[in-house]
């Protein structure tokens, strides 16, 4: 038996889960928030307890030290020697990483180089990797890429209709994201449906603050909504999703807001989406609360959000030539009864329908009506478990 930590490092956060492997038993989980800010918060959950402390955490290395100290302080482990592996989620692996990889300096440098493809994510991912490498240098350390699952896309799906030299020289193409989540829920869907994954056509909808839709045929990704970066695809909490590229030079010429590449990235990635349209919040719960109070901007933000998801589902029905099931996962997909209801109501023409009562109470499983030809499933994602499994694979 061994203990493995799965790590998801954000720019100011570090989410973790400690597993007993290969039993896949969760021993503890936690979240360190506001890294680099005053009043950082470390939360640890184990044995039915929740322990929280507020302190100043300057960087990811200090965050990892606190994580490890907490494991000892709460007697979750008796010695650091019990930890035999760590797996790190990395958003962008580009064309370079087609599978997970053992961490060395070359791999870390490559992750940092690929930050152009995920400027909000890869730098933080690399910081988490370096912190663990410094503090636990001898354990099996593995990077698991969001993009790996999508390397099966055919060229017609991942190429953009730009001059070929930009693909050859600059690697401009669709890479996608959320691959570990899409892969996990596809496998779980096959179990729920009682059929081999290789016989199924699935549309997986990872809908959280970041959101992406994937067409899965016979267990492999054949198309996905996120593109060259996680900015593409459906509308998100603070990201635009797909827009006409000509909008950018137009606004550069006619406003003072779009003067530098940093301005463009900030507005499209951090100030748009639900937040930009509603002018209120990037959180769907806040949007729905405002809608109930009659807020027209919140209503419009919700309507655009639903519309873009419906359009991608329709697109992938064409790509797959039909579907056996649509799967909702991630924060909004798993928890928003309203979004699931609205999305499916607008596309019921092809044979999917949800049972209202199952939708309200269904946090896992089939929420379809008995006569529905296309099943609608709710499956909580577990990206951390996928990461832990990959670490075990590299230990062997």
UniProtKB/Swiss-Prot annotation:
Substrate binds at residue 89. The record marks 178, 239 as: Transition state stabilizer. Mg(2+) binds at residues 8, 383. ATP binds at residues 15, 206-210, 283-285, 331-335. Its EC number is 2.7.2.1. GO terms for biological process: acetate metabolic process; acetyl-CoA biosynthetic process. Mg(2+). Can also accept Mn(2+). It is found in: Cytoplasm. Its cofactor is Mg(2+); Mn(2+). Disulfide bonds: none annotated. SUPFAM superfamilies: Actin-like ATPase domain. Keywords: ATP-binding, Cytoplasm, Kinase, Magnesium, Metal-binding, Nucleotide-binding, Transferase. Pathway: Metabolic intermediate biosynthesis; acetyl-CoA biosynthesis; acetyl-CoA from acetate: step 1/2. Homodimer. Catalyzes the formation of acetyl phosphate from acetate and ATP. Can also catalyze the reverse reaction. Belongs to the acetokinase family. This is Acetate kinase.
């Amino acid at each position: 038996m061994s203990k493995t930590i799965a790590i998801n490092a954000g720019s100011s956060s570090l989410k973790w889960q400690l597993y007993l492997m290969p039993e896949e038993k969760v021993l503890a989980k936690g979240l360190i928030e506001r890294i680099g800010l005053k009043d950082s918060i470390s939360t640890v959950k184990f044995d039915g307890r929740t322990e929280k402390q507020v302190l100043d955490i300057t960087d990811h290395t200090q965050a990892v030290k606190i994580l490890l100290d907490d494991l000892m302080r709460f007697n979750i482990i008796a010695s650091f020697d019990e930890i035999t592996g760590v797996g790190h989620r990395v958003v962008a692996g580009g064309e370079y990483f087609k599978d997970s990889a053992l961490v060395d300096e070359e791999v870390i440098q490559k992750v940092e180089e690929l930050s152009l493809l995920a400027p909000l994510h890869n730098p933080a991912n690399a910081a988490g990797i370096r912190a663990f490498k410094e503090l636990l240098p001898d354990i099996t350390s593995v990077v698991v890429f969001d993009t790996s699952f999508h390397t099966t896309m055919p060229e017609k799906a991942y190429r953009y209709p730009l001059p070929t030299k930009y693909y050859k020289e600059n690697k401009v193409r669709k890479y996608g994201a959320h691959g570990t989540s899409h892969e996990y829920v596809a496998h779980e869907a096959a179990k729920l449906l009682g059929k081999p994954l290789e016989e199924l056509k699935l549309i997986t909808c990872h809908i959280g603050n970041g959101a992406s839709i994937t067409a899965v045929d016979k267990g492999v990704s054949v198309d996905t909504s996120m593109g060259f970066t996680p900015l593409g695809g459906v509308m998100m909490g603070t990201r635009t999703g797909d827009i006409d590229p000509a909008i950018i030079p137009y606004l550069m010429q006619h406003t003072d807001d779009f003067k530098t590449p940093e301005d463009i990235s900030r507005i499209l990635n951090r100030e748009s989406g639900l937040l930009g349209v509603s002018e209120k919040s990037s959180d769907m719960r806040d949007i729905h609360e405002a809608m109930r109070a009659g807020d027209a901007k919140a209503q419009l933000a919700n309507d655009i959000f639903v519309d873009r998801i419906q359009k991608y589902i329709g697109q992938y029905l064409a790509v797959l030539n039909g579907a056996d099931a649509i799967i909702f996962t991630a924060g909004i997909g798993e928890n928003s009864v309203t979004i699931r209801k609205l999305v499916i109501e607008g596309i019921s023409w092809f044979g999917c329908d949800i049972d209202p009562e199952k939708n309200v109470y269904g946090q896992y499983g089939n929420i379809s009506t008995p006569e529905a030809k296309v099943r609608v499933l709710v499956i909580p994602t577990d990206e951390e478990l996928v990461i832990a499994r990959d670490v075990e694979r590299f230990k062997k």
